[in-house]
Amino acid sequence: YCRYPISHRDLEEMLAERGISVDHTTIYRWVQCYAPEMEKRLRWFWRRGFDPSWRLDETYVKVRGKWTYLYRAVDKRGDTIDFYLSPTRSAKAAKRFLGKALRGLKHWEKPATLNTDKAPSYGAAITELKREGKLDRETAHRQVKYLNNVIEADHGKLKILIKPMRGFKTIPTAYATIKGFEVMRALRKGQARPWCLQPGIRGEVRLVERAFGIGPSALTEAMGMLNHHFAAAA
């Protein structure tokens, strides 16, 4: 569900066509339960090897008829770094988002350059994080509009996944669903490719399955692939 632009009801019908009876409310509960857990378990795999030039921006997500702000960061290649859904657009929200993106990163993994729009909230947040020692004082803050084209294009691809939802009811349910969307986007970009033993979507499926303890382990799978290769070559 989190990989494709489809509603819960449409997925219910598609499963029914294949003889599987699942109510759309059950699919909704599955997403709420497993999307955040998937994001948690796979975070180590897709949050690796970022370019030191980061692009920060926010896009709008409608929750109960009101706009909320989805803060997002990608590197200059377009790889997803992190995201954070906030009810407000403020220096406090920007700081919380950037602090989340920096959390757990080694010194050499932190950005050398941050490019944002001209919203003053980013400048205030970056200044505070530098003062607290969470961001290097040498980190450059740029406000070059065209450099953010890559993240604005990425917003559009994420919005394609969000559109069938036709709005969310609460911020927690919106955030839970978006976590699933963001993880699937990161996998489609190839950010976890080094840990996928098989090419394409099959490798991504097996990575998710292994994260939840489903199917053979990575070692067993790799040995099986080697045995198959040698048998085919014989």
Where are these regions (language model features)?
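Charged, often Cys/His-bearing segments associated with DNA-binding zinc-finger transcription factors
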Residues: 1-62, 92, 96-234
